[in-house]
């Protein structure tokens, strides 16, 4: 090591190495203690198995953690983040090298010589300049642009950390720049050093004594800032710098499904309570989610409930619960909240209001947008489970849930009338399956297709299509219960289990190759919630295959004056990744002109939900979701909105009437449109 390295000098008679060791040991001890206190909170969480499919998790870690695939969904902010992230990674090696030299353990020195040193130093210097520009741009963007999605975030922390990162770049630039002017061997590496040379240009008028002071000060400020930054991270929203990669690795792999009431416990009667009331009722992974939130606001910016003025912000729920957790398990114990105080200050119904919890449509837009894979729906449903269990649910649910329990449908209609709609199809025989019957395709109609007159027309269209394609099919009729999708997502886990068990028993009694469904909600719950392995298809997938195989041939030309746009249902698109099948089916219809809305595919805007909104409306909202979605459809120039979900159809038809758009807009189900061309 060069004899005049800052750590080799003495200060007040004490070797610089001793000061470096003091800073190093003190910082690591403090950092370990802070992490331990954070671990205490995670350890208080419930069991959650997250070690399945290691290969898939590692691939996701690379794709979403290192490559940061989701960041550019917000292009400008995403590019800035990627630049700062990778600059921090590249400069991290430099900081470690400086610290190791200061500890007189220069294990990286052999690597920092020769050809690699020239390459690395050039790369490092380039990144220092780029990161400085990116930090400045990020600060100006926040200060001048003031994006709405940052409202409620800890703004000071964002500015402070950006300044710390920039300061790390500047201290190294001036450390190297002064070394270049002093011509120290350790710094005169072969290679282009733009950042160091820029600093040297700034310092070019300084005396040798001043340069030596800058060199020494640059070193000590750099390592002190590095360790201060390290310890500040777990105390701020930038804890995600440490927790983001683990959170992405332990992410939920399967979309559409919900976690059980408690992992590892199948019998609900074994549980003392259902759902979540306190932070320790969440799973350890969900608590890690709270630590990992970057407060970027992408979740709330894409939340349809938030967009129409409902009192729901996924970001603010995360921030509020995280901050309350920090108060409950603080770094130092003198402000620890007592158990008695926790009992009188409930999280659900207190910190998080009932309207926040019931405003969610479980559309998944927040989870689709989150760059660090925070899970919101499971948390919301867990809190609903607590409200249902303690009878704090909206009173409008009571009668509907009683109907589900007594009759297996939300209307309270007898099971004997579940298949009455098929009687109107006198020319088409519909087989009602009994135990032991066998068909190629089982059509699971579900409750709205069975009882609601408007949705029965969609079910009839599906039956007509099956008949025209000469498919051997049948329905369960009176033996079918509601799929339970809505029941589970409003938090009535016990009732869902009952409906599911009765349906599974009936399904096991029949033989079939595949199941098709009317709506994406039943499709999702049969595919992702039911334990019975079976091939489950939404009708759009099924009938597209029939068209592509030539078993169905659309021939009637659609009116060329009409312009169509397709609305992606949440539980078909985001939750199950089915975007192309409905569009390919539409493109197969002769004469149809299709245009896309700006918010489509995985950024589709929820219609209002096929779950809660069916039986409970939130008073605090500026407009209905379906009306806002209709505005988006009209902006494309379309006059016909196509959907593949009966609940979307119900909401859009109602919104067209309330908005007075009967002469301008029309909504049609994809299946009805297909049948009109056959």
Predicted regions, residues:
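Ferredoxin-type iron-sulfur electron-transfer modules and their immediate structural context
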Residues: 230-359
